[in-house]
Amino acid sequence: MTVRILAVCGNGQGSSMIMKMKVDQFLTQSNIDHTVNSCAVGEYKSELSGADIIIASTHMAGEITVTGNKYVVGVRNMLSPADFGPKLLKVIKEHFPQDVK
């Protein structure tokens, strides 16, 4: 199985696109089987079926609701692996250990 990440920002064109690339690089270097997509906060509900983890800024993460085996990771600096990396790895190792190589 591959853990599916969805990067979310206000309009889906700026921060989430860059965050998508940063998360992809980080997870590749961390040997995690993954896919990463991005969208605007207003579109995340239509993208939920293809995501296991939603990653967004802390203020936006509070607006995102998920159920079942889906998780939201709120980060202060969406572009810094030093900020999002440990939080994302914690969720992956706890809930998706089969994707850690």
UniProtKB/Swiss-Prot annotation:
Domain PTS EIIB type-2 intervals: 3-96
Residues annotated as catalytic: 9
An example Gene Ontology CC term for this record: cytoplasm
Annotated EC: 2.7.1.194
Gene transcribed to yield this protein: ulaB
Induction: Induced by L-ascorbate. Repressed by UlaR.
Stated name of the protein: Ascorbate-specific PTS system EIIB component
Origin: domain of life: Bacteria
Natural source organism: Shigella dysenteriae serotype 1 (strain Sd197)
Reactions this protein catalyses: N(pros)-phospho-L-histidyl-[protein] + L-ascorbate(out) = L-ascorbate 6-phosphate(in) + L-histidyl-[protein]
Residues with Phosphocysteine modification: 9
Main location: cytoplasm
A single GO molecular function term of this UniProt record: protein-N(PI)-phosphohistidine-sugar phosphotransferase activity
UniProt domain comment: The PTS EIIB type-2 domain is phosphorylated by phospho-EIIA on a cysteinyl residue. Then, it transfers the phosphoryl group to the sugar substrate concomitantly with the sugar uptake processed by the PTS EIIC type-2 domain.
Keywords (A to Z) from UniProt: Cytoplasm, Kinase, Phosphoprotein, Phosphotransferase system, Transferase, Transport
Pfam families: PTS_IIB
Cellular compartments annotated: Cytoplasm
GO biological process: phosphoenolpyruvate-dependent sugar phosphotransferase system
Function: The phosphoenolpyruvate-dependent sugar phosphotransferase system (sugar PTS), a major carbohydrate active transport system, catalyzes the phosphorylation of incoming sugar substrates concomitantly with their translocation across the cell membrane. The enzyme II UlaABC PTS system is involved in ascorbate transport.
